[in-house]
Design a protein with these regions (language model features):
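Conserved C-terminal alpha-helical bundle
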Residues: 1-41, 63-65, 100-102
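GST superfamily/GST-like fold recognition
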Residues: 2-6, 43-71, 76, 81-82
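Generic alpha-helical secondary structure signal
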Residues: 17-21, 25, 70-76, 86
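Residues that form generic nucleotide/phosphate-binding pockets
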Residues: 26, 37, 78-81, 91
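Residue-level signal for nonpolar/aromatic packing positions in well-ordered secondary structure
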Residues: 34, 52, 82-88
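Surface-exposed helix-capping loop/turn segments at secondary-structure junctions
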Residues: 36-47, 87-91
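Terminal-tail/helix-coil boundary detector
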Residues: 88-103
């Protein structure tokens, strides 16, 4: 679903109010679910796992999804924790040297 939010909120040259609302609201809902999952946990499944590796790259495009991570304090904490990992920093720069967006 976040891929659709990317497309309709950031890349789509043809505006669609329906699609922007539909996928924008769904992105907000998914961040809310993730925020709840992270209550009392450092990572999605407790320890750093493939779940975090799969979700974090989508969350790293929060700006494309028009999501304010400050509205999701547990996601923000999790996002920053993963963004500070050396392997994540190195991987984020492939194929082009770029900075990880930090809210």
């Amino acid at each position: 679903m976040l891929g659709q939010a990317h497309h309709f909120l950031h890349f789509n040259p043809d505006r669609s109010d329906y699609a922007e609302n539909r996928f924008g609201e769904e992105a907000q809902r998914l961040y809310s679910v993730l925020d709840g999952q992270l209550v009392g946990r450092d990572y999605v499944a407790g320890e750093y796992s493939i779940a975090d590796m799969a979700i974090w790259p989508w969350a790293a495009r929060f700006e494309f999804q028009k999501v304010d991570l400050n509205s999701f304090p547990n996601v923000l904490r999790w996002y920053r924790k993963i963004a500070s990992r050396p392997a994540v920093i190195a991987g984020y720069c492939v194929p082009v040297e770029t900075e990880i967006p930090i809210p």
